[in-house]
A protein has these predicted regions:
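Non-catalytic interface/linker regions that flank or bridge core catalytic/transmembrane domains
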Residues: 1-26
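Divalent metal-dependent catalytic cores for phosphoryl transfer on phosphate-bearing substrates
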Residues: 15, 24-135
């Protein structure tokens, strides 16, 4: 099953249905690949969790926002998951904490921050991880 083909404008409209203006500004800092991935993850997440709250859905859209401050490119990202070669690569591996800190500083809800940080292990957190893994 392939992912739906949508334009960047359609992706932004989809994200805008769930994100506050502050959150949307953060989402826009993500590179195009991560924005597309966030849409795919969110669609899988809400398909499995029809009662997802707005904060939970925002976490799905923003779960990789910490990567926006770490510009490694696709090859560098692959290497970063295998070897802690450089400080940038180590930061990439810590993108959840970085993203959660960005969201916290922006005044985003505690629930969204906790889900992005991976600080909870409830049903929503497990379903978000599964959606991120492609399940």
């Amino acid at each position: 099953m392939g992912r739906p083909v949508t334009s960047q404008e359609e992706d932004a409209r989809f994200a805008g249905r769930f994100l506050t203006s502050t959150e949307m500004d953060l989402w826009r800092t993500m590179d195009d690949f991560d924005k597309r991935h966030s849409i795919d993850v969110t669609r899988r997440f809400v398909a499995k969790r029809s009662d997802a709250t707005r904060d939970e859905t925002a976490a799905a859209l923003l779960h990789d926002v910490g990567k926006s401050v770490i510009r490694l490119g696709r090859f560098g990202r692959s290497v970063a998951t295998l070897l802690p070669v450089t400080a940038s690569m180590r930061r990439y591996r810590d993108h959840e904490r970085i993203g959660a800190d960005m969201l916290l500083q922006a005044g985003v809800s505690k629930r969204t921050v906790d889900l992005v940080r991976g600080a909870t292990d409830d049903d929503a957190a497990r379903q978000l991880r599964a959606a991120d893994d492609g399940d």
